Amino acid sequence: MWYVVDYLYTRAATYLEPRGFNIEHCYLIELGELTPKSPDYIAGHTSQQTHDDIAELLERLRRRPEIEAVSLSQNSYPYNGSNSGAEVSYDTLRSPGWTIRRLVTPDFPRVFRYRGTRGETPEQLAEMLERGEFMASDNLYRKYDRRMTDLVGQRFYLFGDTTKTYRLGAALQNVRYHDYDQARSSYSMMVKQSFYYIGLELCVRVREGQDNDFIERLKADSESQFRIGNIFIS
């Protein structure tokens, strides 16, 4: 009986902890690519053209007045159920082996309203990613009793590569994996356009008051505005 009570209390306490993200007014949109079986398929498209087409699609979405922010990411959006990992090292400090790596475009913090421990806004975090800096959860080195907030501005090794360093732009307010999981160690860095492909997550945040019929309106324009080269949304 006491075990059940303790379990339920722990689950409830975890649920009530800050999530570190906000998904109100956010939508996940699927990217697709025409195959040679389609009569509209454009043969001879290079990988670079595909990267450029996806980038243009993002820009067209950003220009829609009802959309506030648009992002691409890999294994990064809340509740996605998948993750990637890689080591973050500084001097003798090493991140846990299960540290979550989020590859994102700069607007990702704006879509999900990430914030820094020093009060950095989503807009400021986006600018840091644009500069090539990375961001890490404040609990990344908790096994050493070190807060990442105290290491902002320092340079780190990522992916086990000791030939290049990356500047820590901000420590993030801890981001949870889902509602019943405590915040895990994680870091975020910018995904380059040369890595764009249809398997990435396309997420948008619409402006307050614009949710009504948003998906229907977007679908109505998808063929005329959001099929670029062989790339489309669905």
Q: What is each model feature region?
A:
Residues 1-11, 234:
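Hydrophobic alpha-helical transmembrane segments of multi-pass inner-membrane transport and secretion
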Residues 7-96:
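Membrane-proximal extracellular/periplasmic loop immediately following the first transmembrane helix
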Residues 28-31, 71-74, 135-137, 152-158, ...:
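Short beta-strand segments
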Residues 34-36, 74-80, 139-142, 162, ...:
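Short, solvent-exposed loop/turn segments at secondary-structure junctions
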Residues 47-58, 143, 149-150, 212-216:
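Well-ordered, non-membrane alpha-helical segments in soluble/globular domains
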Residues 50-52, 103, 130-131, 154, ...:
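Small-residue transmembrane helix packing/gating motifs
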Residues 61-65, 148, 221, 225:
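Acidic-histidine catalytic/liganding microenvironments
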Residues 94-185:
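Hydrophobic secondary-structure segments that place a key small or acidic residue at a functional site
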